[in-house]
Amino acid sequence: MSYFAEKLAELAQVGLNRSLPEIEHQGKWIIAQNRKMLNFSSNDYLGLASDTELQQTFLQNILQEAPLHQWFSSSSSRLLTGNFPIYARLEQLLAQRFQRETALLFNSGYHANIGILPALVDKHSLILADKLVHASLIDGTRLAGCDFYRYQHNNLAHLTQLLEKHTGQYRRIIIVTESVFSMDGDVAPLPQLVALKKAFSSQTEVMLYVDEAHAIGVYGANGLGMAEFFDCIDDIDLLVGTFGKALASMGAYLICDQLIKQYLVNTMRPLIFSTALAPINVAWTHFLFEKLPQFQPKRAHLARLSQQLKQAVELRNGDTLATQSCIVPFVVGENRQAVEKSQYLQQQGYYCLPIRPPTVPKGTARIRFSLTADLTEAELNGLIACL
């Protein structure tokens, strides 16, 4: 046991020790250490998680559909007895909205990302992943067991070099990226990635895998993410997103062709061997996803707040890493500086958290401001005054 104590002491010495926070939620407020603070660290981008009117309407609706006891647990894998009708209804709604053949649900974004890639590749496959993709995609790539390279972040020239070098050597190449990057807030050049995929597909099957976890609900005319914004939904082979952020629910989805879905149902271990989401979670997601186009005013307000905060940080000579989203990083550099800045902002009434290595590269510790549509301009100005 002394080994673990030593390792924890080493983490504490360099400002990397972590602990689970004791917090309470009151809408857009966080209560911690007897202090009430505005939440600037949530992924509840549209502010739906605290919308009690929506919640009450939803609960009234589901009680009319089925008895209460049928909603709380699936009690099984979907391939056994856990496949309730609401799953198919949500998958059909997703396929209809994205105008693609089909969709497949998962328990979480992490669950999706560690399962899809290992199921679809073999020793004749190559994965080319952006250097800054989420930890779940890195883990999925490692679990896949095939050859992989990580191209420089959003660097199309480097990706092109790798494609030129390896096309023809593998049966299948999968390009992997996020659309909105979770820590930097910048955006992948999806149209150019689609063009590269098409350009190299004559010699080798090239597929494009895009994780829209931080884009779904927030971007696009109907809230369908950056793929909708860039009008390239049809060109993305594996379009993944989550429900636990802007959609204030739980779970994840894949938009794909029917053949891919059927193959995953037969081969994806995290899907086959996991108890399915509770039906009430899936029903809540369906309820909100139906309303997604109606939330355009929330998206517009969020975009204005995001631009305002980005400009304010840059005016104070802060590095925002070219963010183009509602994730606004304020890079301070060293771990302890980030922790101290976070503590100061919390003392002023703003719940802002430090992000440190290994979540981000060494020397880029930061405050990661995550904005939500239920924040007001006056509340944002209060934060800006403390920067």
UniProtKB/Swiss-Prot annotation:
Substrate binds at H134, T359. Pfam families: Aminotran_1_2. One of its GO terms (biological process) is biotin biosynthetic process. Pathway: Cofactor biosynthesis; biotin biosynthesis. One of its GO terms (molecular function) is 8-amino-7-oxononanoate synthase activity. Keywords: Acyltransferase, Biotin biosynthesis, Pyridoxal phosphate, Transferase. It comes from Haemophilus ducreyi (strain 35000HP / ATCC 700724). Pyridoxal 5'-phosphate binds at G109, Y110, S182, H214, T242. Its cofactor is pyridoxal 5'-phosphate. Belongs to the class-II pyridoxal-phosphate-dependent aminotransferase family. BioF subfamily. The modification N6-(pyridoxal phosphate)lysine is found at K245. It catalyses: 6-carboxyhexanoyl-[ACP] + L-alanine + H(+) = (8S)-8-amino-7-oxononanoate + holo-[ACP] + CO2. This is 8-amino-7-oxononanoate synthase. InterPro entries: Aminotrans_II_pyridoxalP_BS, Aminotransferase_I/II_large, AON_synthase_class-II, PyrdxlP-dep_Trfase, PyrdxlP-dep_Trfase_major, PyrdxlP-dep_Trfase_small. The keyword Acyltransferase applies. It is an enzyme of class 2 (transferase). Homodimer.
